Swiss-Prot record:
<keyword id="KW-0878">Amphibian defense peptide</keyword>
<keyword id="KW-0165">Cleavage on pair of basic residues</keyword>
<dbReference type="GO" id="GO:0042311">
    <property type="term" value="P:vasodilation"/>
</dbReference>
<keyword id="KW-0838">Vasoactive</keyword>
<comment type="similarity">
    <text>Belongs to the bradykinin family.</text>
</comment>
<dbReference type="InterPro" id="IPR004275">
    <property type="entry name" value="Frog_antimicrobial_propeptide"/>
</dbReference>
<dbReference type="GO" id="GO:0006952">
    <property type="term" value="P:defense response"/>
</dbReference>
<dbReference type="Pfam" id="PF03032">
    <property type="entry name" value="FSAP_sig_propep"/>
</dbReference>
<feature type="region of interest" description="Disordered">
    <location>
        <begin position="25"/>
        <end position="58"/>
    </location>
</feature>
<dbReference type="GO" id="GO:0005576">
    <property type="term" value="C:extracellular region"/>
</dbReference>
<comment type="function">
    <text>Induces contraction of intestinal smooth muscle in isolated guinea pig ileum. May induce relaxation of arterial smooth muscle. May target bradykinin receptors (BDKRB). Lacks antibacterial activity against the Gram-positive bacterium S.aureus and the Gram-negative bacteria E.coli and B.dysenteria, and antifungal activity against C.albicans.</text>
</comment>
<feature type="compositionally biased region" description="Basic and acidic residues">
    <location>
        <begin position="35"/>
        <end position="46"/>
    </location>
</feature>
<keyword id="KW-0840">Vasodilator</keyword>
<protein>
    <recommendedName>
        <fullName>Ranakinin-N</fullName>
    </recommendedName>
</protein>
<keyword id="KW-0964">Secreted</keyword>
<feature type="signal peptide">
    <location>
        <begin position="1"/>
        <end position="22"/>
    </location>
</feature>
<feature type="propeptide">
    <location>
        <begin position="23"/>
        <end position="43"/>
    </location>
</feature>
């Protein structure tokens, strides 16, 4: 029973470290591509005609 608890604790600890490293990498990637994403949003926004609201009920 003790070895099973020890193994589960080790897996939890390693999983937590792995998740934090993934978050750091994702945050760094988001900072890199922030400018590119804004340009994409601007390009997409131009395609919608003025006054168009897709969620308006008749």
């Amino acid at each position: 029973m003790f070895t099973m608890k020890k193994s589960l604790l080790l897996l939890f600890f390693l999983g937590t470290i792995s998740m934090s490293l993934c978050e750091e990498k994702r945050d760094a990637d988001e900072e890199e591509t922030e400018g590119e994403a804004k340009m994409e949003d601007i390009k997409r926004a131009e395609a919608v005609p003025p006054g168009f609201t897709p969620f308006r009920k008749p």
